[in-house]
A protein has these predicted regions:
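Bacterial N-terminal signal peptides
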Residues: 12-22
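Helix-start (N-cap) detector for alpha-helical repeat units in TPR-like alpha-solenoids
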Residues: 26-27, 60-61, 94-95, 128-129, ...
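Structural signature of tandem alpha-helical TPR/SEL1-like repeats
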Residues: 39-47, 72-85, 107-119, 142-160, ...
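Structural marker of alpha-solenoid helical repeat scaffolds
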Residues: 55, 89, 123, 164, ...
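N-terminal leader/linker segments that initiate helical-solenoid repeat arrays
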Residues: 24-55, 60-65, 72, 306
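TPR/TPR-like (Sel1-like) alpha-helical repeat modules
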Residues: 135, 139, 154, 265, ...
Length: 306
């Protein structure tokens, strides 16, 4: 009897070891994959994550890591599939909701991103990046979702960020864009100046500042800001276009022509740039060049409407 008991105990012990080993191996594969992922060695991380996942297909932690690696490798379809599954299996994991929402935002699937990022913010209210992406998603999904108070919802997220971190990159710029959209240029001006105080190299914000000054009829100052923006980002056609408008409004026709030419040189398909240049040529009594630019504008507009 004692021998039989000993045999049973031994068998149980061996069986227990056999059961533990696969789990230990899975954990090693997962940890190794995680280490490689954190070191941005994605191609090495992927097969390790696949090995961990092979023995436990419904482990949300393994699924999430696998999806995150795929996202880092720009394999968006599979990444989205796995991150979606991870959030479904573990809806209260804040990192899962955040990473899935961030992927949808990155793919510009803003309407889909809204509920996911709302969940991420609910799970982790201090995640300011999630709030920024949610604010952007509200704006960019407006035509699809038709949320009537999207501006209020957007400002709610952005103001929370400002309260927690007034220097958060881009937050004042985004608040300004809301004010520009709602027809409040004076408020936009204040936010843009604040953004540029913190981040003077933000050429896009400086472009918005120049265009806002144009709306406020401060033409000379607008041109000054847009010249600075052009120095910061000389390849941005919209800056050259805005600068041409500022010069024209300020009565500097020759400089306006040069800036408009620069715009269409940078982007030959910039339709409004060709139209502005045609008007400037007309004002400069150069009818042939004006007709050529107007014809180019019509061609581009016709192509875009087809």
């Amino acid at each position: 009897m004692r021998r039989k008991w000993s045999t049973i105990e031994f068998t149980r012990s061996v069986l227990a070891v056999c059961l533990v080993l696969p789990a230990f191996a899975q954990q090693n594969f997962y940890q190794s994959a995680l280490d490689k992922f954190q070191q941005k060695q994605y191609e090495e991380a992927l097969p390790l994550a696949e090995r961990a996942l092979a023995d436990d297909r419904n482990n949300p932690t393994y699924i999430h890591l696998y999806g995150a690696i795929l996202a880092a490798m720009d394999q968006f379809y599979l990444a989205e599939e796995n991150l979606r599954k991870a959030t479904t299996l573990a809806p209260n994991e804040r990192a899962f909701a955040y990473d899935f929402g961030a992927l949808l935002h990155r793919e510009r699937k803003y309407a889909e991103a809204v509920p996911v990022l709302k969940r991420a913010v609910a799970l982790d209210p201090e995640n300011l990046t999630a709030r920024m992406m949610l604010a952007r998603s509200y704006v960019f999904s407006f035509h699809e979702l038709q949320i009537p108070n999207f501006e209020e919802l957007t400002l709610e997220q952005l103001r929370y960020i400002v309260k927690k971190d007034p220097r958060f990159p881009g937050v004042h710029h985004h608040i300004a864009l809301v004010y520009i959209n709602s027809g409040e240029p004076a408020k936009a001006l204040e936010e843009l100046n604040t953004e540029l105080q913190f981040y003077p190299t933000n050429a896009q914000a400086r472009l918005e500042l120049g265009e806002t000054l144009l709306k406020l009829n401060q033409f000379h100052k607008a041109a000054e800001e847009l010249r600075a923006a052009a120095q910061q980002a000389p390849q941005m056609a919209p800056i050259a276009f805005a600068l041409a408008k500022a010069y024209r409004a300020d009565g500097q026709t020759a400089k306006a022509v040069d800036a408009a030419r620069r715009c269409v040189e940078l982007d030959a398909n910039f339709a409004d740039g060709h139209y502005l240049l045609s008007q400037l040529y007309r004002d400069a009594n150069q009818p042939e060049q004006a007709r050529e630019e107007l014809e180019r504008f019509r061609q581009l507009k016709g192509a875009s409407s087809q």
